[in-house]
Each structure stands twice: as C-alpha cells, then as structure tokens.
Design a protein with these regions (language model features):
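Hydrophobic helical h-region of N-terminal Sec-dependent signal peptides
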Residues: 9-15
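N-terminal signal peptide c-region/cleavage motif recognized by signal peptidases
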Residues: 17-19
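N-terminal secretory-pathway/extracellular module detecting exported/lumenal segments
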Residues: 22-82, 86-187
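Bacterial N-terminal signal peptides that target proteins for export
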Residues: 1-9
Length: 187
C-alpha cells in the first residue's frame, strides 16, 4: 500500500529538470475544495479525486493527497499534504506534508499537526467532505478542474489564481450592490 506523499514524490520529479514523456506521466482528477481569494494573497486547496489515488487505511480511514497552491511571495509553489479522512467520526488529519519550490527546485518537509480535527480548519473539513460526501461536491461549491498530469496542474496555478481573484472581485461587487439596495429607502 503506497502513501499519497510517496506517490506525490513523483510530482517533484515531473516538475524538475528530468525529461518525462507526457504519455507516461501519472494523472489525477483534480478538484478545488477550498479557496481564499484576495489580491496577491490567494490560496487554493486541491484534492486528487482519482479513485486510484485514494487509499484505504485500517479502521475505514481513507488517505488522499491535498495540494495547497499559495500565491503569496516567498511561499513554496505548492505544499502536498497526505490527509487521512475518517468519515464515520467526521474528522480528518494531516499525516505528512512536503513543500515544493521551483526557484530552488527543492522538496522539503513542511510543518503540520497530525491531530484529528473536526471543522477547525475549513480546508481540512472540505477535504473530508470531498471524500465523505461525493454526491454533494457541487452543492459544497467544489470546482472540478479535470484530469491532468501533476506538471500540467503546477503550470495551471497562475490561471487558477486569476480565476479565483476574478470571482472574489465579482462577489465583492455583488455584495456592495446588495448593500446599496438595502440602504435605499423603501417607497
């Protein structure tokens, strides 16, 4: 049984300087499960929903890879988390994490807490719900990005942030319009 973090080590190789034939690159089925968008500080959490990349653990626990893309300067290009999900007890935890930086072409262990959590961290709760409530993904506003290789996923980061920032700006404009209508006197 492979660990998603070990499986995702191939991601670093794909993104490095080693040439890889595109047909042989492992692919995942990626979904945006949580995002926080603001100008220059956007974060997006993606889950690989490919059933072949979701691992069964003892006790009914499932393990899945979650990717954090962080737009802030000085942050790694992305962080890969190995997340265990316990649907029965409505909890999730991180069991491993790696930061990838394309500037230095490095892969380093990232800090994380391995404590079981309920809803304390929205991205972790959404990752749990992605696995435990697959029929509700659209209702939970999870966006399907599609099937792609890890290298394609990493290259899509800038476009993803453009889209998320545009959506955040749109939502703010709509909120301001709604506030303006609320403040108008009734006739």
């Amino acid at each position: 049984m492979r660990s998603p973090v070990k499986h995702l080590l191939s991601l670093a190789l794909l993104l490095g300087t080693l040439p890889v034939h595109a047909d042989n690159a492992p692919k995942g089925d990626y979904w945006v499960v949580h995002h926080q968008a603001s100008l220059g500080k956007s974060k997006a959490y993606l889950v690989d929903g490919d059933p072949g990349n979701i691992y069964e653990r003892p006790g009914g626990v499932k393990s899945v890879g979650v990717y954090l893309f962080d737009q802030q300067p000085g942050k790694p290009d992305f962080t890969v988390y190995d997340v265990e999900v316990d649907c029965k007890n409505k909890r999730a935890r991180v069991t491993g994490a790696l930061d990838f930086s394309s500037v230095a072409n490095t892969l380093r262990k990232a800090k994380f807490s391995n404590q079981w959590q309920g809803d304390q961290q929205p991205w972790l709760a959404q990752s749990r719900d992605f696995i435990c409530k697959p029929a509700e993904r659209q209702a939970l506003k999870m966006e399907h990005l599609g099937v792609m290789s890890a290298s394609e996923l990493s290259r899509s980061g800038p476009q993803l942030f453009e889209l998320l920032t545009r959506e955040a700006q749109r939502a703010e404009i709509i909120r301001q319009i709604d506030d303006a209508f609320t403040q108008m006197p009734a006739k």
